[in-house]
């Protein structure tokens, strides 16, 4: 099993992708003078989300004695970051490490690019393609369709996947229905990544740090990170069975904080 060197976290509570997306939309909503009641409702939801995240972190910190290697890798704590670190910040003069990712060779179910090799880098490229396709759909149907086709049995479902939760938070904070809106534009760029570790050739825990650009009359940007168990099933990588891994820090790509957290620049070859 290959593991990244352990990095000590800061101890700050980690914000989930759903919470960060809701916060992004709150900034746009406030700027557009939408009713204060919406803001209060979202803040209430975020408070509960933080409580749930802390409970999950405590559980991850005390794994069961009979935990498998895959579970141990997935639940191992990641570095943490302040929520403000997810917002655009000064780009570092320091060069980050580089991860070279393969390019897709075909199109798979739910219009997700596929054909990546059976390597850790291939699994990371596949996760990036899954997330980009799901979130750029801008609708609940879009994210549900993607995870239905790209999760192994025992993995995330259209009800439990963090991507579904994130889309629901974004649409709710924007005052939109589950169908989205022609006025909503979401551009998702996988900018940095890391390979947390592998167990054999068919299992990897990988993370992608995305730059989200969301436009609803005005444009806002934020970094959102996603870590998933990736399993080789048949002839492709899919999101594997089990609970989603410990979250990676959502940090604006290219900053000192991102490099310190272990993120590496992604380069397609």
What is each PLM-predicted segment?
Residues 30-125:
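Juxtamembrane and targeting peptides
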Residues 85-103, 223-254:
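Short beta-strand edge/turn micro-motifs at domain boundaries
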Residues 22-25, 38:
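N-terminal, charged low-complexity regulatory/assembly segments
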């Amino acid at each position: 099993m290959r593991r990244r060197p352990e990095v000590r976290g800061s101890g700050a509570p980690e914000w989930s992708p759903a919470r960060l997306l809701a916060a992004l939309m709150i900034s746009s909503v406030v700027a557009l003078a939408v009713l204060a009641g919406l803001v209060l409702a979202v803040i209430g939801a975020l408070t509960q989300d933080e409580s749930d995240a802390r409970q999950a972190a405590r559980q991850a910190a005390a794994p069961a004695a009979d935990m498998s290697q895959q579970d141990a890798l997935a639940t191992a704590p990641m570095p943490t970051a302040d929520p403000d670190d997810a917002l655009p910040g000064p780009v570092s003069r320091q060069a980050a490490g580089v991860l070279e990712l393969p390019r897709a060779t075909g199109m798979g179910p739910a219009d997700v690019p596929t054909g990546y090799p059976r390597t850790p880098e291939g699994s990371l490229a596949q996760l990036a393609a899954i997330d980009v396709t799901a979130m750029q759909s801008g609708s609940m149907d879009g994210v549900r369709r993607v995870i239905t086709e790209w999760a192994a049995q025992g993995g995330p479902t259209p009800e439990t996947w963090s991507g579904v939760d994130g889309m629901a938070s974004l649409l709710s904070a924007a005052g939109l229905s589950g169908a989205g809106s022609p006025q909503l534009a979401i551009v998702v760029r996988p900018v940095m990544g890391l390979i947390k570790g592998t167990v054999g050739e068919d299992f990897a825990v990988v993370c992608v740090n995305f730059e989200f650009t969301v436009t609803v009359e005005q444009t806002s940007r934020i970094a959102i990170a996603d870590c998933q168990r990736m399993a080789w099933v048949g002839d492709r990588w899919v999101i594997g069975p089990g609970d989603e891994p410990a979250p990676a820090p959502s940090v604006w790509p290219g900053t000192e904080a991102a490099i310190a957290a272990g993120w590496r620049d992604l380069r397609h070859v």
